[in-house]
Regions:
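Short beta-strand-to-loop acidic/aromatic patch adjacent to the donor-nucleotide binding site
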Residues: 84-95
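Glycine-rich, basic loop-to-helix element that forms the pyrophosphate-binding segment
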Residues: 62-79
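Acidic donor-binding loop at a coil-to-helix junction in glycosyltransferase catalytic cores
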Residues: 160, 166-178
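Catalytic beta-strand/loop signature of glycosyltransferases that borders the donor
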Residues: 190-201, 213
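Non-catalytic, C-terminal membrane-associated alpha-helical segments of glycosyltransferases
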Residues: 212-223, 229-279
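Short, well-formed alpha-helical segments that are part of the catalytic scaffolds
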Residues: 11-28
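Conserved donor NDP-sugar-binding/catalytic core segment of glycosyltransferases
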Residues: 95-128
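A recurrent flexible, glycine/aromatic-enriched loop bordering the glycosyltransferase active site
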Residues: 133-153, 171-172
Length: 279
């Protein structure tokens, strides 16, 4: 069976995944869709209610949590890449509406970066695309897993995610940006705000402990700087380092001692990563 769109989703718990699957199943009345789902940590789900004439589901299992890029690569390897299909990598808390499926074939003709709206407030954008048509290398920061629609022919050529990058690794970010750059080198992405999905808006740092914020910022900084240097984007990597220190200065001026400390440490981690990996 051929599919028009294939979703590759990894899941480490069953908190949000049911809502994600339900949004696809209930709103898809037009596309031949396959959901490839990797359940980790012995997560168990009843999937029968999500299978429809338009939506098929294939499930793989892991008894423990593995890094995100490795998990996605397992899904990529599990299924022959369908040349005529489009692929997406939603998070387990992504949500889709009927508009997405109804207008997909009218809007998507090649590699595309779509908009992402906030789940909590659907008029607020989590990520809005520029009005210009073509994505450039410098648009790497506008590419995240949930908004990339990628042709099967492109994925055939690009292959796997870089398993040094992403959640669960020392370089804990940048895997989506890296994949975007590699795909964009084969077929240039276009921007579209006419198609979207939904994602929870970011949590405010005031609601998190310093230790949790630090872990996130350090991991992000290492990943993004490493990714940019991998692609020889030295100026962009240097800008990421500088932004860390500028963030510290800004928070000091606001007398926000907690976040000033976080940005100071994060900036230093970025600087160390820059020096360690520049060639």
């Amino acid at each position: 069976k051929s599919f028009q769109i294939i979703f590759l989703i990894t899941c480490t718990n069953n908190v949000n995944i049911s809502t994600c699957l339900e949004s696809i199943s209930k709103n898809n009345h037009s596309l031949n869709c396959l959901i490839l789902l990797l359940l980790q940590n012995n997560v168990k789900l009843s999937l029968e209610s999500y299978i429809t004439p338009y939506t098929s589901i294939k499930v793989l299992h892991k008894t423990h949590t593995i890094p995100l890029s490795q998990a996605r690569n397992i899904l990529l390897k599990s299924e022959r890449i369908h040349a005529g299909s489009f692929y997406m990598f939603p998070d387990d808390d992504s949500v889709f509406d009927q508009h997405f499926f109804e207008f997909f074939t009218k809007i998507i003709t090649g590699n595309t970066l779509i908009a992402v709206k906030g789940t909590q407030s659907k008029s607020v954008y989590f990520l809005k695309m520029p009005e210009r048509k073509w994505a450039l290398i410098s648009d790497f920061d506008k590419a995240i897993s949930v908004n990339m629609v990628i042709k099967g022919t492109t994925i055939q050529k690009v292959g796997n995610f870089d398993e040094k990058l992403g959640v669960g690794n020392y370089y804990g970010a940048g895997e989506d940006n890296d994949y975007f750059l590699r795909c964009n080198a084969i077929e240039q992405f276009v921007f579209s705000n006419d198609l979207w999905n939904y994602h929870p808006l970011p949590c405010k740092n005031t609601l998190q402990t310093v230790s949790k914020i630090l872990i996130r910022y350090k991991s992000y900084g290492r990943g993004v700087v490493y990714m940019l240097l991998k692609h020889r984007m030295i100026t962009e990597a240097a800008k990421v380092v500088v932004k860390g220190y500028l963030g510290c200065i800004k928070k000091l001026m606001m007398l926000n001692w907690k976040m000033a400390y976080v940005y100071l440490i994060a900036g230093s981690v970025r600087f160390y990563t820059f020096l360690k990996n520049i060639k």
